[in-house]
Amino acid sequence: MRLLFVRHGDPDYVHDCLTEKGKREAQDLADYADKWNMGTCFMSPCGRAQETASYVLKKLGKTAETLPWLMEFVTCLNINGHEELLEAFPDVRLNDGSMIAGPYTLPGLLKPEKLKEFGPDENGNGPKYGPHIVWDIMPSYLAKHRELLDPEDWRTSEIAKLGDIPYYYDYVTGKFDELLAEHGYRRDDFLYHVESANEETLVFFCHLGLMCVLMSHLLHVSPFAMLQGCAFAPTSVSELVTEEREKGIASFRALKLGDVSHLRAAGEPVSFSARFCETYDNEEQRH
């Protein structure tokens, strides 16, 4: 089995759509798509992913199924009362409500009490800090809390517990495994049992965080190792395949991570999205 993970094009997060650059990237991806031998396609319900997929699907004459759990993996983190986490997330926003809705929630999945934590009390006052995504941790904090990079111990870290990350992680990876089982590969603890060996290709048009979570599950590493160590550019393609070295037992291996051949072929600059400054003194890049 072959899996392709495609990140959406350069995003306008406020309106959940593509920027003009993102539209060019999506067109470049579509023009190159026949070289990827794309098979059965699935996509996130978020507008930026659906818009990206639409270029490819139209070019190839294909359709895609929308899967709600393919939306971005963005359980919120509430650091109010845990101000020591400002060391990890010094860029957390003040609580103006701007991150409580839209692409920062998981409809039908986010626990209502989580959102209530950021709402006003009986006096109309809310907590000082708003929600923050659970990655983009400062390197110095990560160095002091290496449990975040452990394949098992990340689950008991302060950040994981505060953000209910194991709950969301298990939900999403569980849905993913259900889909793989429908296509012949059933997860059993660490391995996949091959119930119907095949060389089918499944394509997922989705998001950076969600891709990191799913790939960490396939490669048996902490999600934080992927979230902190990888910046898959908009419209990049990552390829993983099964290896059945023992009859009936499959594991996954990454062949390509963040491939942007289509952008380079078209002369389109690769977006800086998801990256931070290459040098601290570069004020033009995100800190």
For the regions a protein language model found, what residue spans apply to each?
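Phosphate-handling substructures
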Residues: G61-H183
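Glycine-rich phosphate-binding loops at beta-strand->alpha-helix junctions
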Residues: G47, L210-M211
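Active-site-proximal alpha-helix that buttresses catalytic centers in soluble enzyme cores
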Residues: M1-T75, H82-G97, L162, P166
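Acidic, low-complexity terminal tails and accessory targeting/binding regions
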Residues: C76-R93, G174, E182-E200, V213-H287
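Generic beta-sheet signal
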Residues: L3, E200-C206
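Active-site metal-binding loops of divalent metal-dependent hydrolases
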Residues: G9, L208-G209, G258-V260
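Low-complexity, flexible helical/coil segments
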Residues: M38-S44, C76-N80, I100-L106, S238-E244
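Conserved glycosyltransferase catalytic-site signature
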Residues: Q50, L208, P234
